[in-house]
């Protein structure tokens, strides 16, 4: 199968991060899974992934890349961002599975423990976004809390990719606080933290037996399962009753033109 991974970061400025992501995904993917990497077109600053207005703009880029991936023959799409940007919107346009890693990780976490803790970056807006995603997933009653690491993001997501050991220890400190608040399982609410944890073999809170879940790797495995369910049993890629109702081609073209998005029905720039 061929799975497209859409990165919500600037390719040219994220070499160290990209290497860690590729290493992680190569470890967990099936032998017959081919990964195609795509990047959003406009992002240049890391802060553009945590504030509401640039998140909206990034969603448009993600949807475009997802439509493009389907036209190129991909079997599923995974957005490599723990905010799941564009996932809901893309599902209304695609006939292949569209996976949000945070949604996938939260629902998997519910099978590992009763109370879920989320460790994320040192950013108040993103910590609040993580709470919102747990609520959207229907798991707010099972959320033990959200803890941010104690390393500023400009350091964690630059120096950390070259030397992830200090970030690893910061994740452990935050996870222990969540366990003290009742968490039985910890989800990493950050793509960057996820890849640094997995690349330093951090999969549980030391000496506690509490799982720590890498959202990006889980997202890839969910994508593989979703493809199998559709191919083997003809399970629809999403429910077409409700918020994932499929938009017809005529109206899709109309809206792309109306908002001057500059791409055609296959996601290509026009």
Language model segments and positions:
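Short beta-strand segments enriched in small/hydrophobic residues
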Residues: 1-19, 116-120
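C-terminal and late-domain segments of enzyme folds
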Residues: 6, 189-199, 211-237, 270
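N-terminal beta-loop-helix "entrance" segment that forms/cooperates
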Residues: 39-59, 154-160
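Glycine-rich, highly charged phosphate/nucleotide-binding loops
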Residues: 51-68, 166-172
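Glycine/small-residue-rich loop that forms an oxyanion/phosphate-binding "nest" at active or ligand-binding sites
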Residues: 63-108, 112
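Short, acidic/small-residue loops that bind anionic groups at enzyme active sites
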Residues: 91-112, 201-223
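Short, glycine-/small-residue-rich phosphate/pyrophosphate-handling segment
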Residues: 110-148, 166, 226-265
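Active-site rim beta-loop-alpha module in soluble metabolic enzymes
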Residues: 122-124, 134-191, 198
